[in-house]
Amino acid sequence: MDNLLKDMGKRIFDRRKQLNMTQETLAELAHVTPQTISTAELGQKAMRPETILKVCDALHISTEYLLRGVITEA
């Protein structure tokens, strides 16, 4: 599970940087705390399912990409 959390965290971090967002901006857009974003990016704590959905929406990525690194075509 640790590798999954670290991989998810890296995908969040990379996408956030790609969008030129701060952790604070992402937190505002996802309606979560900056601490939630920080711990997720570091792979320190699993996110709740509803938080995953909000973060994915804010980053304009699919849950499949966040969880598995798979890019799906629309």
Indicate where each model-derived feature is located.
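Short alpha-helical DNA-recognition segment
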Residues: 20-39
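DNA major-groove recognition helix of helix-turn-helix/homeodomain DNA-binding modules
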Residues: 50-65
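Alpha-helical residues within the helix-turn-helix
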Residues: 17, 28, 57
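Short, charged recognition helix plus adjacent turn
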Residues: 57, 67-74
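Residues in the recognition helix of alpha-helical DNA-binding motifs
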Residues: 15, 29, 40, 69
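A short, Lys/Arg-rich alpha-helix, primarily the initiator
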Residues: 1-18
